[in-house]
Amino acid sequence: MSFSLRFYTPPDFTQPFLADAPDVCFQPTPFDGVAPEQYHAMSIFPEYFKVNGTWLLAEESRMDCVAVYENGKIIVREFRLLKKGDLIAIGRTEDGSQGIYVHANGFSEERELQEVFAFRQGRSRETAFSKDYNELYEILRHDRDHGKIVWVLGPAFTFDKDARDAFSKMIAGGYVHALMAGNALATHDLEGAYLNTALGQNIYTQKNQPNGHYNHLDTINRVRFHGSIPAFLEKEHIDNGIIYNCEKYHVPYVLAGSIRDDGPLPPVFGNVYEAQNAMRDQIRSATTVICMATMLHTIATGNMTPSYRVMADGTVRQIYFYCVDISEFAVNKLADRGSLSARGIVTNVQDFICTTAKALGL
């Protein structure tokens, strides 16, 4: 199939309701981390703010954050990062009447007439996904060279040899530009490389190994002994796996900790807000985001990913967002964000990544 990005059509600012709209009002924050009353909360869509008669687009957006006017630009900032005196956009309307316009239909898309009552409107095990797979393959081929592909992984990948190998090939093939996960993904991947097990089970035969329940703890302990993951890989002569290939091909990875973690591994963020900052740093330039088998990290990533990206040349393009999970709830939770770019695929993620790697010729 022939793939092309959806064309973005900006608002027509000559329309009377936009041309005659007032400038947006800004008010300073009274204290660090506190927005003024009637602050405007951002959505996932392109949003424009009228300043001195000119409509400015918020270039790096994030839902449920506020718009700050700074150095002639609209900067989207989390509440916790606000500083006293920051100028915050005020207004709860989105139709331009307060100098704020949310442009929800900027990307061209063929829309068919939909009936009020129809079967299978959500995504389930009965949904046909062939078209979704083919579109995803084309997106990955495009963004390998013309975008940034960010993957968000749960530990399920590390429990299967073929899935682990397939994702390693994806990294080597240039289809992974950043990886976000938790302590478990990295721990069990390194366990697989070090001891050929995940949670004490052989990653191919799935047979429990003697005292295998120690294996992930031994792996963490050994990494901590060496002081870092790169040192562990070198000293223990590790030559396979997801984390190994991230290091080999200089793919950045963010490991966000949780309250149930063992260890953790040295690079894991123990502070949730530092982890969130590091994740958003990767999302700021992402053009395709694929989340698999981790509801917590998927929802967190979805909340910080807008539906669009402003590229270096000033063009606005769509961000493609996929949620792949065997749980229908997890998939439909992301679809409920209301984004035309959020797509769900209900399947076993181990099979999914193997199928995807083969389709890409890896």
Regions found by a protein language model. Name each.
Residues 1-83:
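Long terminal accessory regions outside catalytic cores
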Residues 31, 139-141, 145-228, 346, ...:
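Metabolite-binding pocket within alpha/beta catalytic cores that recognizes anionic/polar moieties
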Residues 83-91:
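Loop/turn positions that initiate beta-strands
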Residues 94-95, 153-161, 184-187, 261-262, ...:
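Gly/Ser/Thr-rich loops at beta-strand to alpha-helix junctions
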Residues 100-104, 161-166, 189-195, 265-268, ...:
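Short acidic, glycine/serine/threonine-rich loops at helix termini
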Residues 109-124, 221-225:
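Gly-rich Lys/Arg/Thr-decorated short loops/hinges at beta-loop-alpha junctions or inter-strand turns
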Residues 134-149, 170, 245-246, 281-286:
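Glycine-rich phosphate/diphosphate-binding loops that line cofactor/substrate pockets in enzymes
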Residues 203, 209-251, 261-289, 294-362:
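C-terminal functional extensions of proteins
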